[in-house]
């Protein structure tokens, strides 16, 4: 069997920054460091940070007063920020800057009293944080996941409306939903460019090319990773078998029946070393050659907070 690697795959700049913030906080301040929610949605990464002294919690009520807490890459609501301030918690914010950009759009709509529509997945921490930027009772923010949800929106055609999206959605599904929104609300405003981030976009485009060449597409990523799930769904939509896997032990022999070419990609929160360990396991199942596709090389970089830059600390 032949292995073809998608390009780009794996860590994006926002994930890289978030992990670095936890690592640097541990290095400078020592354990324990509290992290609200999994800093990124990857079990391998989270377990590694936990072993080094990070304590992952879901609510700030689990964090002692005055302790250091890190907000995950997915962002948090204004209410969570205020709670941290009220309790004198030392906060390092690992929110991806591209998520912060969406937060600013929502906050702007809230200040103006413009009703906002967020396209995203209910219950996802990024969505909860984004919804929590809106506080104006004279307006409102409404969540939709798919085209069918639009019919249930309470707004009128001539209402002052704006929309924004979660950063890790399917490009195809989101384009369809935005088109339907604009059809129902012709005057609705939105970002000049959709909010789906560069890493999500590039990785989905890479999977399109990968699926054309593969009998099976393996996506390295955790089940709670939105962008990883979208990659697996896209491959399936293109008529190729796909599997989402968290670690080498997830691999099953019957996946490879009638498979000559295996395509491999990785979600934006999956480290390269995990991908390499999966490739090593695939060799035991008969994979004997590896090819990497050409693709858009990521050159985006997001700086960590000033207080965590080692040279400036020293």
Curated annotation (Swiss-Prot):
Recorded GO CC terms: cytosol
Protein's GO biological process: dimethylallyl diphosphate biosynthetic process; isopentenyl diphosphate biosynthetic process, methylerythritol 4-phosphate pathway; terpenoid biosynthetic process
UniProt keyword annotations, A-Z: 4Fe-4S, Iron, Iron-sulfur, Isoprene biosynthesis, Metal-binding, Oxidoreductase
Cross-referenced InterPro entries: LytB/IspH
Class of the enzyme per the UniProt entry, highest EC level: oxidoreductase
Residues that hold isopentenyl diphosphate according to the record: 41, 74, 124, 225-227, 269
Positions with a binding annotation for dimethylallyl diphosphate: 41, 74, 124, 225-227, 269
Catalytic activity: isopentenyl diphosphate + 2 oxidized [2Fe-2S]-[ferredoxin] + H2O = (2E)-4-hydroxy-3-methylbut-2-enyl diphosphate + 2 reduced [2Fe-2S]-[ferredoxin] + 2 H(+); dimethylallyl diphosphate + 2 oxidized [2Fe-2S]-[ferredoxin] + H2O = (2E)-4-hydroxy-3-methylbut-2-enyl diphosphate + 2 reduced [2Fe-2S]-[ferredoxin] + 2 H(+)
Positions contributing to [4Fe-4S] cluster binding: 12, 96, 197
Pathway terms, separated by semicolons: Isoprenoid biosynthesis; dimethylallyl diphosphate biosynthesis; dimethylallyl diphosphate from (2E)-4-hydroxy-3-methylbutenyl diphosphate: step 1/1; Isoprenoid biosynthesis; isopentenyl diphosphate biosynthesis via DXP pathway; isopentenyl diphosphate from 1-deoxy-D-xylulose 5-phosphate: step 6/6
Superkingdom in the source lineage: Bacteria
Signal peptide bounds: none
NCBIfam families from the UniProt entry: ispH_lytB, PRK01045.1-2, PRK01045.1-4
Record function comment: Catalyzes the conversion of 1-hydroxy-2-methyl-2-(E)-butenyl 4-diphosphate (HMBPP) into a mixture of isopentenyl diphosphate (IPP) and dimethylallyl diphosphate (DMAPP). Acts in the terminal step of the DOXP/MEP pathway for isoprenoid precursor biosynthesis.
Family: Belongs to the IspH family.
Protein name: 4-hydroxy-3-methylbut-2-enyl diphosphate reductase
Protein species of origin: Haemophilus influenzae (strain ATCC 51907 / DSM 11121 / KW20 / Rd)
Gene: ispH
